[in-house]
């Protein structure tokens, strides 16, 4: 987008063009102005999350029936968010870390950079810049995860087994 009106779309050397181009991309990716990206939730101890993901959207009323609340204990549907709003479950650090219900705006961020960690970081940063609070549930730090070499090896194994995951880049 040529936001500066100088006749060039310059996302490298023009901050206004870069920001306007990003905003245009998000709009084309179904960003909904005035709607949240998501929020941290509390799930009941007996909750079965098998088969759930950020892609499998359910109405907030259904999540409520299954025992979810916002992390502060308040209802999921409040303010300008109705009980029919669709959200998916995201637990980026597994069962020992924070869990989120994410909406279409999270998906728009994800489409810009296909990494849940990126989308979550950008979404949370935007909340914090507007006075939002930090995540309540601590992020587990005792699990080092797997190394880049181990990720590459796993990707190579998937490719050898016929899965089309693109290049093994770790």
Residue ranges of predicted features:
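Acidic, glycine-anchored loop motifs typical of Ca2+
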Residues: 3-11, 169
């Amino acid at each position: 987008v040529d936001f500066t009106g100088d006749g060039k779309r310059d996302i490298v050397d023009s901050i206004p063009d870069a920001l306007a181009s990003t905003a245009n991309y998000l709009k084309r990716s179904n960003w909904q102005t005035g709607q949240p990206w998501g929020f941290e939730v509390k799930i009941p101890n007996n909750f079965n999350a098998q088969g759930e993901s950020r892609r499998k959207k359910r109405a907030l009323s259904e999540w409520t029936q299954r025992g979810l609340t916002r992390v502060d204990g308040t209802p999921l549907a409040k303010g300008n968010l109705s009980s029919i709003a669709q959200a998916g479950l995201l637990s980026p650090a597994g069962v020992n870390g924070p869990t989120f219900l994410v909406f279409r705006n999270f998906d728009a961020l994800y489409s810009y950079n296909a990494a849940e960690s990126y989308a979550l970081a950008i979404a949370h940063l935007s909340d914090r810049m507007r006075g939002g609070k930090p995540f309540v549930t601590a992020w587990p730090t005792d699990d080092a995860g797997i190394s880049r070499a181990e990720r590459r090896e796993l990707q190579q194994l998937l490719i050898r087994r016929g899965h089309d995951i693109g290049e093994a880049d770790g």
